[in-house]
Regions:
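Conserved N-terminal beta-strand and adjoining loop/helix that marks the start
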Residues: 1-18, 39
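A generic fold-level signal
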Residues: 2-4, 13, 84-87, 110
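Short connector loops at helix/strand junctions that flank enzyme active sites
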Residues: 4, 25-27, 32, 85-89
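Short, hydrophobic/aromatic-rich beta-strand segments within well-structured domains
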Residues: 10, 19-21, 90-94
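Nudix hydrolase/Nudix homology domain
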Residues: 22, 27-30, 95-155
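The catalytic Nudix box helix
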Residues: 32-68
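Functional cleft and adjacent loop/helix regions within the main domain
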Residues: 33, 39, 79-81, 150-155
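Active-site-adjacent beta-strand/loop module that shapes the phosphate/pyrophosphate-binding cleft
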Residues: 70-103, 116
Length: 155
């Protein structure tokens, strides 16, 4: 299999802003909570697990509004991870039903160092590695019609 099956969570608060998280291993790199599916795991089960692991939200704190995918991207030439040459994400739009304060990215061994809420059109594609930019552009356009996406660097 070329692409690793994966899920990503676009968490939207009541005002319409979406949650983005800054990677712990790369300052200035922002993304949605995401992760690979384990063997035999369904996309919804993977989503619930990843949201709990990465931002500490239990299943009753959000509703699933929409899912689309897969959106694929390839790793740079010559790179494989866990035997895969890329990832295929199903993106879930989640509506936050609990207070925003429940979102927690500061647990020990956390994948993220911080989080913030932005309007979808404020997402700067330069926050991502080049391999992910096309997929994120499509996701944001498909989910939000965000046509004024920012990109401060070339790519």
């Amino acid at each position: 299999m070329l692409y690793r099956p994966a899920v990503a969570a676009i968490l939207q608060n009541r005002s319409g802003r979406i949650l983005i998280c800054e990677r712990a291993d790369a300052a200035g790199a922002w993304q949605f909570p995401q992760g690979g599916m384990e063997d035999g795991e369904t996309p919804i089960a993977a989503l619930i697990r990843e949201v709990l692991e990465e931002i500490s939200l239990p299943r009753n704190a959000y509703s699933i509004a929409w899912v689309r995918g897969p959106y694929r991207y390839r790793f740079p030439a010559g790179i494989t991870k866990k035997g895969f040459r890329g990832q295929a994400h199903h993106y879930f739009l989640l509506r936050l039903r609990a207070p925003k304060s429940l979102v927690n990215v500061g647990s020990p061994n956390a994948e993220f160092r911080s989080a913030r809420w932005i309007w979808p059109e404020e997402f700067d594609l330069a926050w991502l590695p080049p391999m992910k930019r096309r997929a994120y552009r499509r996701v944001l356009q498909d989910f939000f019609g965000a046509t004024a996406l920012i990109q401060t660097n070339s790519g």
